[in-house]
């Protein structure tokens, strides 16, 4: 199908113009439509908000005026005299005058009548007695909408019917609660007065009443009676009948529940600012119009005659009213609009609705307009846009054909000229061929029609040659090449082809630049990869060396265990066997200590964040505990060991040794504090002890015999800004170099590096504490640390000697844990070491100053010995255990040469130490009483079964039943309970086949068994302990099981006699 280019151009222009016109028309329609709708919606919302505010203010005015009446002294005095026994009419004579005076003070609100009721129903009466009926002297003649029985008109203020019954509550007393209710279940309270009405006397006048309790002026809880005030509703009707902002068809409607109290019943409450709506009950509630809707002149009736006469209808018939009641009014303007809604009669209208924000009523105010009036601007806009679109399209359709014909005229001329060049005359070449030249050449030579002979055929041949050459290049394998520049010839006229050539050359130059830049970046990345490769190889070498070292540290105690076990199997002498077993016990405890250090550090590297246990502690306790902990080790190596409170400017040992030897005087803190040794501080005492024990243990390990280890405690200043991390400076520290930041970038981020939340603390820090910077110095005369390792000793698995032939053992985690704990407490750790002269560690920690304690010579070891969890966890300790981090302590202990291993096993030990240290043994109280114990052991491992049986046998427990999983344990307990037998104690492993220990414990507890259940598990994390206790277990023993831990369980649940411990050989 051939379509002329003029037609194509015309259709293209027409379609383009129509598309642009349609886009503009649609955008204009959407924008203006939304604008018109928004303006109309905002207009309805504004009118609804204004009308609602007027009605609310009138109701508030009525409530405020009524409350001023009940506070009058004459009224309250008369009521008090009435309850005192004065029931005469003279008692209320002055009150009647006082009430008439209050009603007659005419202002913006007209008050007509008032009645006062007693506060309770007297004997023999069915409802509360009216004590006072007052009608204002200035009340106009108002005929009520009903007559006397004799047919005469009833006027407001007449005796009897002159007080409209529908405006006065029927106060009856509930026999169960002895409270007065106006209607069935409708109380009258100070926060919820009762509004009745409006009662329409004619088409333009209505009456309303407000009932509220009379509160004694001297006692807010004393109700003297109730009052009902009748007022004019003309202000409400004036606000409803005002035509401002309503247009030609707008109406103001007021919907209310079809109940006399003007509120929805319980179970069908609408939404408020603080409560959700009860949609199910609210949907079927009956509502009515407060004031009858009357059609405007010239408008059709939009409401049925029955509804307009006061009949009720379901709330769901008016969707906008139901929607606004279901919407909480949490903003200032809580009105909603719907320009395409329907009223209860099914008439399509545009409405704006708002819920009255009043404690007196639950009304909905509706601004209603006809749909035609609301969308009249939209209809005009639609007509204008359609007329513009079709009119413009018609004009374009008339103008395009001639314009297209004129526009393609040059193209047609070019086509004719091309036909002359491409279609030569058939026959031999003649000089006339020179007249057939390329039209482009004609234009370039300004009309010159002469060309070189055979120019057309030469160009044709060149074109064929280029095609052939290009075809050959396509067959060649593709290689990336940067295109070369195109030679730019001189030109007079600049056109699109000239711009294209220039842009192509710029692109080629940019490609060359980017290619060279890419080569440079590749070379740079190659160099970085080489550096990374070298670093990886170095790290791999360090890892290999660490594995070799830690393998030696782990295999050394393992070798002692296996070797001495082999000796015991071939030995018959009992004393030698006991000594060999003592060595096995010590080696096993050392192996457990090494594994605990590795596991503790691994937990710190992930998300198990350590939490501080901050509380009050005495600074002197730190010194006392350190002296007792290291007493034996210091005596064995004959090391000069001292712990002193010093002034901030006290020099190190190697500088002036004579200063250390002289007797120091009292050392005080900053002005307003106390002596250092008498200070009571706020912080985590045990984390400070853990750091110091690590540092002192490290110094004692490397210090030779007859050496010196000194601990100095100083207060170097006061922190001015406690919220920031303390970084105090001192002239005495100017020559020391901080290590905390040197390896921060090279180590992985751990949970200790994250800021600590306030919720991690177990106790609340007392307010207004002064923050002091405490400095703990640990100095030794050991070999020192080489200069090249001082930047790395605080990194994990790094030691001063990394060789395989090193003299000292250890995992290399102690100083790393110290650094982590110091950062956790917003402190810092530094070192200064010189090879051959010793090492000085300095720890600065901000602590809160609480008070000064009285001097005491006793050492406090209770906090150290009792604050950390041991191998045994009970239900009473669960609250504190779950709050304390799992790596605060472990239950494994190491045996010393001067105390029994089992007694040491119950003493505390801190993790992350170079060697295990223990507090002195606490004397064990001897148990009295004898009881035969019947025990059940649930354990799937045969070796563990044998260990438990033999350890129970050592405690004279032989009646033991062994099962291999949780299901058998449950079945065994169930069978024994059916036979009337009970177990005195149940040992429950956690990880077992078929049914684990936790689930088995839950089933046993659900069965009603109350026997003590003790968990046995090697997984001693806080989460596991908590799960065990929550399942119903009573205690928790961590594996490996220690005899003191087992004794503690037996002493608690089944007391047995305990023999005195014999010293080991």
UniProtKB/Swiss-Prot annotation:
Post-translational modifications reported in the UniProt record: Activation probably requires a transfer of a phosphate group between a His in the histidine kinase domain and an Asp of the response regulatory domain.
Repeat is among the record's keywords: no
Gene Ontology CC terms: plasma membrane
Domain Response regulatory: residue ranges: 934-1054
Keyword annotations: ATP-binding, Glycoprotein, Kinase, Membrane, Nucleotide-binding, Phosphoprotein, Signal, Transferase, Transmembrane, Transmembrane helix, Two-component regulatory system
Reaction(s) catalysed (UniProt annotation): ATP + protein L-histidine = ADP + protein N-phospho-L-histidine
Ranges for domain Histidine kinase: 549-849
Post-translational modification 4-aspartylphosphate, affected residues: 989
Residue ranges, Extracellular side: 28-383
Membrane topology: Single-pass type I membrane protein
Region spans: Disordered: 719-769, 884-903
Localization annotation: Membrane
GO biological process, one term: osmosensory signaling via phosphorelay pathway
Glycosylation sites recorded in the entry for this protein: 86, 133, 150, 170, 202, 216-217, 333, 345
Enzyme category, top tier: transferase
Ranges annotated as biased composition (Polar residues): 739-749
List of residues that carry Phosphohistidine: 552
Enzyme Commission number(s): 2.7.13.3
GO molecular function: ATP binding; histidine phosphotransfer kinase activity; osmosensor activity; phosphorelay response regulator activity; phosphorelay sensor kinase activity; protein histidine kinase activity
Signal peptide: 1-27
Membrane spanning residue stretches: 384-404
Major location (coarse): membrane
Biased composition (Basic and acidic residues): 750-764
Cytoplasmic side: 405-1065
Role noted for this protein: Nonessential protein which may be part of a two-component regulatory system activated by changes in the extracellular environment.
Full protein name: Two-component system protein B
Organism: Emericella nidulans (strain FGSC A4 / ATCC 38163 / CBS 112.46 / NRRL 194 / M139)
